[in-house]
A protein has these predicted regions:
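C-terminal segment of classical bacterial N-terminal signal peptides
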Residues: 23-35
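Pocket-lining segment of extracytoplasmic ligand-binding domains
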Residues: 104, 178-179, 184-271
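Secondary-structure end/capping motifs
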Residues: 239-316
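Short, solvent-exposed loop/beta-turn-alpha elements that line the ligand-binding surface or hinge
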Residues: 66-74, 290-298, 321
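N-terminal secretory signal peptides and thylakoid transit peptides that target proteins
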Residues: 2-21
Length: 336
């Protein structure tokens, strides 16, 4: 068996398990739109929230999902968000059905009562986020962050990175000055010198390194996992598992393609993001491909994230991460 054939079998096995019941419906030959019409629904679509980077951006750029779902009479609507927290706000209020975010946004959303479910994740990618300082900064170690102003997007993956970085350095969270800004505003503040450091993720991280010559004080390696999660509203996931199965299968195909075509990935991402190809090539070199079901190990990792925010009273209440899974599809096995 060839490596490429083994990859295809692995992808089919993994994603078949994700929505086995849906696969049975699809195998019966009844298109999704016909099923919807039988339920009295007029239009079937999936509204996808994405950020300006990653597998969903590649999927949008290649147009393969639209072609696949058109065969089932299903439309696709894409909405861009600047960061994970606002994307999940969109999911919670019903403006989108599905999207991808980092580790921390689902924790904040679940603690706020959002009715979302995890449906998959990409592998850990700790080098894709970092705390950076201006090229001429005198800050040399994480301990030097004490008393400093640090720009970050509240409730994002880098919020957790900052917690773990400070913990490693023995600096209390109360002893820094977090400045909560979305990426574009944070970059402006960083360039003006209004903040001393910036916790940020790719491709904004790569842009800061390439365009501003920002210096990495610490990235996520040895501190955080930095998984990328695919989430859906619980209502949509329960009602349309067959559509989500198709979406995740197409995500897996794009992951396989992206892993083997870095130059084409950089070309598509440059066009989609408006960033230079050198910037997105650097960012893409740190990205990990390979969507999987959410395993017990990943859920345990997410629970540690939740507990860290809860211990500092940064979320309104403790949460149990596994409550945000569909019970019949938890797939409580460790990821291979």
């Amino acid at each position: 068996m060839t490596h490429r054939h083994a990859q295809r079998l692995s992808r089919r096995t993994t994603l078949g398990l994700l929505f086995a019941a849906a696969a049975g419906v699809m195998a019966a030959g009844m298109p999704v739109a016909a099923q919807a019409q039988a339920r009295g629904e007029v239009q079937v679509q999936i509204r996808i929230g994405y950020q300006k980077y990653g597998t969903l951006t590649l999927l949008k750029g290649r147009g393969t999902l639209e072609k696949r779902l058109a065969e089932q009479g299903v439309g696709v609507k894409w909405t861009e968000f600047p960061a994970g927290p606002v994307l999940l706000e969109g999911l919670n209020v019903g403006s989108i059905d599905f999207g991808t975010v980092g580790e921390a946004p689902p924790i904040f959303a679940q603690a706020a009562g959002a009715n979302l479910v995890y449906v998959g994740n990409e592998p850990a990618s700790p080098a894709s986020e970092a705390i950076v300082v201006p090229k001429g900064s005198g800050l040399r170690t994480l301990a030097d962050l004490k008393g400093k102003k640090i720009a970050l997007n509240k409730g994002s993956n880098v919020h957790y990175l900052l917690l773990k970085a400070l913990e490693k350095a023995g600096v209390a969270y109360a002893d820094i000055q977090p400045v909560f800004l979305p990426p574009a505003d944070a970059r402006a503040a960083f360039e003006r010198g209004s903040v001393d450091a910036w916790a940020i993720w790719d491709p904004f991280l790569a842009a800061a390194e390439k365009q501003l010559r920002a210096r990495v004080l610490a990235d996520g390696k040895g501190l955080v996992a930095n998984y990328q999660f695919y989430l859906a509203s619980r209502a949509y996931a329960e009602k349309n598992p067959e559509i989500l199965r198709i979406v995740l299968d197409e995500v897996a195909k794009v992951d396989d393609w992206g892993r083997n075509n870095p130059d084409e990935v950089a070309t598509i991402l440059a066009a989609q993001t408006g960033l230079g190809k050198d910037v997105v090539a650097l960012a893409a070199s740190r990205y990990a491909y390979g969507v999987k079901p959410v395993s017990v190990d990943v859920i345990a990792s997410q629970q540690r994230v939740a507990d860290a925010f809860s211990s500092l009273k940064l979320i309104p209440k403790p949460i149990v991460v596994k409550d945000a899974l569909l019970p019949a599809r938890q797939l409580a096995t460790s990821a291979k």
